[in-house]
Design a protein with these regions (language model features):
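Gly-Asp-aromatic-enriched flexible segments
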Residues: 1-167
Length: 167
């Protein structure tokens, strides 16, 4: 049991409003990008490992999402992660402001939301924790998504250690 969204990020299907994206960047791609950002200092000033950056398309209210290979949820499992932003080069917060979303799809059906968190760059990371009990025994594709609130230029959104595990 268990599912590591960081390790499996290269197996996810990443898309933005501009179409399909290749995992791994480059971080200059105006269509948006998803890539590893290990051992980078985050907005809280701490250097983190297992950091997945998901930057939305560089337009107002841009989006990006990654649909992961199917997983069968085990009784008692939870989705956990810390969410936040990469800071500016000088370590201060930029204008990052997004909605982080955890969604899922069952059997190619419609996308169903599991959690949504609005976050601005404020010098802290936020811990998220979602009980997956309603999905126990179901085989679903989880989707990590970022929706920009307004301009997306500095939406260097990161998921730290995103995973499904038993507590």
């Amino acid at each position: 049991s268990g599912y590591d969204f960081y390790t499996r990020a290269s197996n996810a299907v990443w898309i933005s409003g501009a179409g399909n994206l290749t995992f791994g960047g480059p971080d200059t791609d105006d269509k948006g990008f998803a890539m590893y950002r290990d051992n980078q200092k985050l907005e809280d000033g701490v250097i983190a490992t297992k950091v997945l950056e998901t930057h939305p398309q560089f337009i107002d209210n841009g989006v990006i999402s990654g649909r992961y290979p199917a997983y069968t949820v085990v009784q008692g499992e939870r989705f956990t992660a810390k969410i936040g932003f990469l800071p500016l080069a000088d370590g201060t917060c930029g204008t990052g402001n997004v909605k982080f979303q955890l969604n899922y799809r069952e059997g190619g059906g419609s996308v169903t939301p599991l959690g949504e968190w609005t976050k601005t760059c404020d010098g802290t990371l936020r811990s998220v924790d979602v009980d997956l009990t309603p999905l126990k025994g179901k085989t679903v594709e989880f989707i990590l998504a970022i929706l920009a609130n307004g301009p997306s230029t500095q939406d260097w959104a990161v998921w730290v250690k995103p995973q499904i595990a038993l507590p």
